[in-house]
């Protein structure tokens, strides 16, 4: 039964309280509070007297009395204040609330925390007594401002001021005051009130105050303001208008960009719903148009992906963004508006990256229609390459993101992009046609638009335009022909236009255009068989024969592959003798192609691996530089760079020259003419050709060591800028700049595309037929040569996709001694095919010829990890690619764990981990428990309050339900079924467990629970690593744990990041670590330097020395611990990357090094130099390494070079250095030693108290 207190009892208590001394008041207050616990109502006449006596008690210097009032009395008395009439509550807000707000600045947590709770109670009562009235009910004078939080804080009409408004006014005064603790606690009160009242409590009036607090002079206030803003604006229920207003205030009040970007990212990043582009490209399109049409596509990946995400808060925010861009696109391009135009284009791409086109599609389309597309039609034609290139990227991404919603713009843009296909600037022409391919692939306009556009392009005189047009014709038929058949047939004249386009293209003077048209024809034949048959019958005999040979459905019977030691160099003869010499040549060529195809299948089964970064060939002379050799694509996924087949655009076609058509590619007898595996058509000579082509054993030998006196100066190691920038990994970490004329690059599969064949399959020029040793290749007899040329021309595209040879520079021939001046790399074959020793004589028989497959494994790319190859690889009979990496481990191996446990830096953690596992072992069931058995434990973990038993059960469940690495396509079905069964156990559980553990691992948790939670995290990484997707969240969690002062926790983070470096994709982990480090340093800014105003340089320098860690403040120790952790982790990742990737990432790494090298802490400066040494271990070029940090002073550079020399990683000086196997092993040793040094340096960040 609820207890009641009479008016006389309360008055008696009040009288005793007024007359008693402070110690006696404590007893009275505590006893009266106990009486009020079961009371539901107090007499109205006694409320006001108690409200009037409370302020002196709250302001009392007697600490026990103050604590009793706040903790034992107010939580029970304030809810009993009647809500109606509101005079009692108004008196409480006017008398008690100011006193409570004063106590928010009390240093004792129990005081300011209890005061905050009482303020929240008063706020809840105020909102219940007078719910807010919408702003629309106010008159023009604003006097009836009932509950609207957007009202002015300086309300003159006090009688009309509502209770919520009065409560807000007092709290705002505190937030705008000077006491930092009051501000921090006031923001906590605001957060609690918003969580309790929800939408009833508006946000707009608080945003200005909170934005000002983001730039407060006290770090604690800034940190709490960040967290408060994120907590108020991040829930999905937050109105978009509030976010838009917040973004506007950030700009208007000039908040620092680092703070603003971090907050906007945290508020908006979790809202985007991923939307995949329509998968309309079938397997045929993916197979035939998968590769980049020329080397020019290589730099586009790094530039196209290097766009910062722009988050949009609301449709109104998006409308303002577009409106601010429109003035830049008015009129012609000038020196003043071209840069804003480019920034606007990049910003729109950033919006798409932030999913603005998905969340606010209607507003996005309206913005495009409002003038943005018209502006892009100007920028895409800009003479400035960067502006035009960014516009092409945007025009490619818009159809991919918008799909059918982009249809309204297609008819306007196609003519503009069509004109660009004839541009002489190859880079822009290729980018523009990539955009056309994207439009054709992802939009759903009427086929009339595409067919008319393609038909007009085929009628052009420019061969480049015709080449692009026939490739677009092929793409259109693959994507749209089947489902658009009825529309095409129902539109008058459209099918005739399509038929005429085919007739024109099949009779084109350029063979490349004809070949691509033949491939497109058979897709046309599948849909309109009768018309295609009529068209084919109208061709002459030779044209029809070539068309039939291009039929992909024509399959030849497989032939046996070559033997490894007893091969004759030619396939076995047919059972029946060919009737004529011409048929004999045809059969011979067909058998050669079958042999190549069969060897490629063996290579696919033998050398299947994970994707790898590929590169284009580097030519010796700077004069021969293609658009493709401008940079290295940056990896953006755990398996390296995957080229999207649906976005690649075909290259234009060049007409063959007499010199290129009159000569044939033959096996080169000298090392400098070894054909590069990339883009090279590998031929296996027939007996007929072998009679006129001599081989030399020099092909299998290393080039001479002495340099050639006739070597051109432009080929020196130090002279060619291209050689200094682009190098390629050799056997075990060294980087070769080439053998002879060019470096042997990595392998890349080239699609079987006729246009590309015409561009890239260029034969050797006549000036290159003469060898430097004086020997000349003998030509075939004219009659035989003519027959071979005719037959091969008709069958050259029948086989599988081939490797092709880039166009060499005419007239540049070099002797075999050319490569003696640079480190040489053994020739690399595509597959581990069967080989035979070469003949010792120049005219030896063809049995010694080495058979190389040209069929590539589509998955034979690998990430740019450092190679681990044998030092004797160059002398091996079967050679492997120089950039051959081990596949990325998909699971933690026992060897990895054992190696980590043997490190002395983390012994305390391993001992504690074993101890905790032994404690949990009694809970382990005899058989693996079902998934529903740990559902209560997972729910407790998600709530943030798990018990020790909950965590132990989750850890045991993880260890008893491991998930093996995802099987590859070559593995048997049993392995795949086992993987799916193991994965099914975790369906719906893994993300909950992983996210719950990472969120739970915070430094302020109980030590025992925190250590057990770390055990759970370790079990997940060790046993369920194939299921882990969000490594970014994991990195953020590890950096958060660096705020702990517990040595075991810090050792655990050290060991875990060392393991992640081994099992994660290093490029992806490097990006995540950079992001987490930036976030950590933003949360823990550097303390203001006391020597900033010191004019004495010696005193300033000495003040930066950290002589004793005991003198450091806790905040500084925490910052240094996380900073050191991040620098050393990044260094470990760097050691697992290759030189081209380091060159690409060098400026960003250099910025990290430069900031750390200027840090006042000596341990951070030491870590910065260690990171620089790690970069040097990979590049082996101190000039290149120091170029990444151009802001270093000369003294700092000298010190860095001194450290390189002392650690043995400074490169040797001179052009005649010898690349021995011992040197290769030594460089691998340098990496291992540096990894150990970084691990040791990381351990110094463990705070031991």
Curated annotation (Swiss-Prot):
Disulphide-bonded residues: none
Q: Where are stretches of biased composition, namely Polar residues?
A: 809-822, 831-844, 863-878
Major subcellular location class = cytoplasm
The UniProt keyword set, sorted, is:
Cell cycle, Cell division, Cytoplasm, Cytoskeleton, Microtubule, Mitosis, Nucleus
Any one Gene Ontology MF annotation carried by this entry is: microtubule binding
- Where in the sequence does UniProt note compositional bias of the Low complexity kind? 138-156, 555-574, 647-667, 708-718, 1089-1111
Q: Which InterPro entries match?
A: ARM-like, ARM-type_fold, CLASP_N_dom
A GO CC annotation recorded here is: cytoplasmic microtubule
Positions of region (Disordered): 138-161, 545-619, 644-718, 755-846, 860-891, 1084-1118
Q: Does the keyword Cytoplasm apply?
A: yes
Q: Where in the cell is it found?
A: Cytoplasm, Cytoskeleton; Nucleus; Cytoplasm, Cytoskeleton, Spindle
Listed GO biological process terms: cell division; mitotic spindle assembly
> Per the record, where are the segments of Basic and acidic residues compositional bias?
581-600, 755-774
What exactly does this protein do?
Microtubule binding protein that promotes the stabilization of dynamic microtubules. Required for mitotic spindle formation.
Query: Into which family does the record put it?
Result: Belongs to the CLASP family.
Subunit structure and binding partners: Interacts with microtubules.
Entry protein name? Protein STU1
**Gene name, Swiss-Prot/TrEMBL:** STU1
